[in-house]
Amino acid sequence: MDFIITIILWILIILFLLNEVIIRVVGDAIVNMKASEHTPFTVDEITQDSISLSTTINVANEGKQCATIMDCYVRQLLPYEQFDGVKVEAKAELKGVPREDDYFEAVLIQKKESIDIVIRVKLIDRKNNDIKQTLTHMVDLPLDIVNQHAARYPWKISKETIVLTSEEIAKLADIKLAD
């Protein structure tokens, strides 16, 4: 009986090692979100009480296998304790495929190809009903872009952070920051 268990264990070890060798030879997907190279933010819309901004981030598959981006979302990092003048709404969407429900539909990235993801940020005035007046006191706005991706390996979650500075926001809103 011990002999059979030993044989089964050796077979499992050999299969595991063989799988590792195959993955190394065949390769895998390497997903690279190039957040640090995002396009400059632009104004999509400005109203009395809000401003909508967007930027585009390239996501490249630099590996040898197809990758799946299963989810991508934006987490704004502006607590009310730091600045309570605006409510921040942020989302990610595949370029050219806008969705009203804020759902990010899974997308394949073939080997050695890339896609563009649009990051949309809306700043809504919470107090004065005048976004330009409120933004004169705005602080830097960190944004975490989180994506879940998979290929031959088990799924992974990756996060990149970009910062929308108060100076950028002031320039886009055509205002001057308060001292």
Question: What do these predicted ranges mean?
Answer:
Residues 22-113:
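N-terminal topogenic membrane-targeting module
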